[in-house]
Design a protein with these regions (language model features):
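PLP-dependent class I/II
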Residues: 4, 8-14, 19-22, 26-32, ...
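Conserved N-terminal alpha-helix of the aminotransferase class I/II PLP-enzyme fold
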Residues: 64-97
Length: 396
């Protein structure tokens, strides 16, 4: 047999997916496991969205659409971006995708040539570097640890840029850290992006989950609209993770290329999911406000329950994750003698001994921390925190 694709075989599997799958299998096997691994809201898809999908099915709207998506849906996305974000797009610049992850792939595929560098602030979402490598690019990590509030600045970006730099991949609000760039911080970054003449892929999927500041899109600043691809979707904001629907909003020449890519790949996202997204765009924000309130309360609870750590976690400004520093406990042993050498050992021992699944920071490029998702019920958060505290206090 001839060999398989080297490029594809070199892609690392998603550690967040692997941990979530492991936890679900343990639960299926009858084990007592609490999982705070997956970034998935624990609320149901709102009724208006369900009804929009049902009505589309009953009306026979189940055939092929244009590769870039249904025109009415793209018009509604453009309207949302205008009214909520101050961004000006024609419907032809919107490409509906099978989730925001697919939108990130489209953006990178449109931009990257072999040997191009893509700057990725670290910690980062696990998928970013793997997609860059898959497409022949080189991920260049710019460290932004807890001492920098998990954010890079214009000087960091300037130092990282070389003639090979094609783009920066910015996640704001950030998974896994919950960091949110203020308008002034983002404006300073935008000026440097323009000065360096690079592209910006701005993943804004957590835009509605901001606690302490106003959300600002990277594309709003002077010189940015023509070089920014905005990524967004409905999985987090409208509890539609399984529907797989998102979008790229791009400058016209890039949008045209993305349309070609999609036409030869998936053709288009699910017809029914697009109509469900239209229902989401047309409904009020009451569900979003309810989730914001719930996540704000859970954030406070998680900060209180993890305050015993030697290094206290930084309060997340957005999203629904707590990125907790645990490196103070590396080198210690579990009661059965296992040495905790890093975040992977920490999380493995925690799952094995206490039945709590969280994600090691190593998956996100920061081995000093672990990630909790607080998109879970109050009961499960309490159980998780009890188990986490017991585990840490048993380390010797």
């Amino acid at each position: 047999m001839k060999s398989l694709s080297d490029r594809t075989q070199n892609i690392a599997a998603s550690l967040t997916v692997a941990i979530d799958t492991m936890a679900k299998q343990m639960i299926a096997d009858g084990k007592d496991v609490v999982s705070l691994g997956a970034g998935e809201p624990d609320f149901g898809t709102p009724a208006p969205i369900q009804n929009a999908a049902i009505e589309a099915i009953r009306a026979g709207k189940t055939r092929y659409t244009a590769p870039v998506g249904i025109l009415d849906v793209r018009k509604a996305v453009a309207k949302k971006l205008e009214e909520e974000n101050g961004l000006h797009y024609d419907a032809s610049q919107i490409i509906m995708t099978s989730g925001a992850k697919h939108a990130v792939f489209n953006a990178l595929a449109a931009l990257i040539n072999p040997g191009d560098d893509v700057i990725i602030p670290a910690p980062y979402w696990v998928t970013y570097p793997e997609l860059v490598k898959w497409l022949g690019g080189t991920p260049v990590f710019v460290e932004a640890g807890i001492e920098k509030n998990f954010k890079i600045d214009a000087d960091d970006l300037r130092k990282a840029c070389t003639p090979r730099t094609k783009a920066i991949l910015l996640n704001n609000p950030c998974n896994p850290t919950g960091a949110v760039y203020s308008k002034s911080e983002l404006e300073a970054l935008a000026k440097e992006i323009v000065a360096q003449d690079i592209y910006c892929i701005s993943d804004e999927v957590y835009e509605y989950f901001v606690y302490d500041t106003e959300f600002t899109s990277a594309a709003v600043f002077p010189g940015m609209a023509e070089r920014t691809i905005v990524i967004n979707g409905f999985s987090k904001s409208h509890c539609m993770t399984g529907w797989r629907i998102g979008y790229d909003a791009a400058p016209a020449p890039i949008a045209k290329i993305i349309g070609k890519i999609q036409g030869q790949a998936t053709h288009h996202p699910s017809n029914v999911a697009q109509y469900a997204a239209l229902g989401a765009l047309n409904m009020d924000k009451s569900n979003v406000h309810a989730m914001q309130a719930a996540f704000r309360k859970r954030r406070a609870y998680m900060l209180e329950r993890t305050s015993f750590l030697k290094t206290k976690p930084r309060a997340p400004e957005g999203a629904f994750y707590l990125f907790a520093p645990v490196s103070d406990y590396y080198g210690k042993k579990t009661p059965d003698g296992k040495v905790i050498a890093g975040s992977i050992d920490f999380c493995s021992a925690l799952l094995e001994s206490k039945g709590l699944a969280i994600v090691p920071g190593a998956a996100f490029g920061d081995d000093t921390c672990v990630r909790f998702s607080y998109a879970a019920s109050d009961e499960n958060l309490a159980k998780a925190c009890d188990r986490f505290e017991a585990f840490v206090k048993e380390l010797q």
